[in-house]
Amino acid sequence: MIKIKITPLKGIDIESVGEILLGQTKNDVLRLLGRPSEYHAANSLLYEFYELRIDFDGSGKVEFIEFIYGPFPERTELSLYDINPFNIGADRLIALLSEHNNGEIDDSDGGISYAFLNSSVGVWRQFTQKDVEEGIAQAKLSGQYQHNPSSFDDDLGNSRNFWTIGIGVAGYYRL
């Protein structure tokens, strides 16, 4: 597994490759990581090998780095504050990020996403554990649960962690 250390407000350090820093130029990123898997948009590069996406501001400088494979990495092992953010559970990750954020948190999305405004860290998942548990209860009442219980159980397992984590430049989530 490729070890990647995430440092909010600074950037990432990819073991045996080097650092991608917030504010670094697109050309510097291309020199370090090579050609991307996909030019996701005019100002976005997707590197599937490193399981991440890098967004650039209008000046061509790194403004956001997002890890997109969540708790199902194929090649990477992440470290944020010396902990893998995708293996500790959503509640523990929120507590950890809150402790290091030391300020305002945008939690207006009903537990689906959180933006830690001081540390410029964001996390996202498709649904919460509560959402899935309510869906299971309704499916059991309607008789639909028994037709595909493994799908519901998979969703329940997936709801226990966030699926993406991103870091941005200072003030990224205040823009």
Which residues make up each language-model segment?
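Short helix/turn-capping signatures at newly exposed starts of structured segments
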Residues: M1-L175
